[in-house]
């Protein structure tokens, strides 16, 4: 609440109506959460890493660096408020990104400057932008991710700025989009995989390797732009590997990545098959547990008294785990199982679109509470006394029923509008957004966990684009009917 008051009192941006519009959509959910941020069980780890500046075993350090950097910057001028640090930069990036998407994807006969970041829009574009922003706020789960002290909102920002990067023609705007893409990608390990897979898929399609049907798409996105995106996708990998080298973890994306991969092998059943085939001739410590493997990745990774601790733990299991992982990737039988498991996991993940996953009451003696108490006393008091998350007073079932119904109606409506009035530009970028969401489902389901939170964090972009397509269709239809015969 203190962050909100200070924003309206002191910020010049707060006196500009477009930025205020962004707050009008978010405020109801801010109050629905009790005027507090939302937290998951991982939020405390990010805050702790931000203070220690250590390289974690199980996640990217860059979201913690983002929190620490903005905290130190704010402390030069005023008392840092966690709500401002967590919410305002992503909110502005989302607002600007969606604003620019309207200008790029919904051109009119009298367009505003397509490259300059200004506010003037034509009347039709204003209605499209207003409908898209309000849809994102009230008909999708976007606000719940924006209010979380988590890096998940940066996955949606990544998707939006990938769309902008592909459509932008000026060098200056391309550089600006590229910087946002890099920053968003390094916030979460899965974002790196998503960006790389999307970039490869788009480049292959535009090169024609997926069929001649892709050739007409070159008029909307140049082949050179797809190559640039592919090259750009390598930079976050270099940054993440560099951070681990700097932290003494060696040349690796994550020192604990082998643990997560082994957890996935437990979950998809490949490890059990491998052990049944190999234990007789090549026994290893896992053979004693082949009939009692955990059903889910998180059970393997986070059970402090589970198989992980009995087979070396985080620090002494890498050699054994990598030997087994490479063993499952060296024979056609296991490779086929990997492909089958990836398809199945992606299919399960991509339909999980509900908000509120992980936003349950948290242990008040855990790391999160200690970090808030030491460094953000106002947020600590709100978390302890006012947070409706802590009181289980946020009815996510109610909101999710709205989101499900809205998504179904809007997606079907967009497909109908594109069928009745074909728009190759919109269809192309709608397809790219859908591809991004599918690739995010693949990367999170196959290398992390099958959780609604990991898919819903960017799925909301499709309903938002859908309402823009529908509004544009009705404006175009009305304009055609008004033309004299």
Put a short name on every predicted segment:
Residues 12-39, 137-138, 232-245:
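Transmembrane signal-anchor helices characteristic of membrane glycosylation enzymes that use polyprenol
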Residues 28, 77-88, 341-433, 437:
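Membrane-interface anchor segments at the N-terminal boundary of transmembrane helices
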Residues 154-173, 177, 181, 198-199, ...:
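Specific aromatic-rich, kink-prone transmembrane helix
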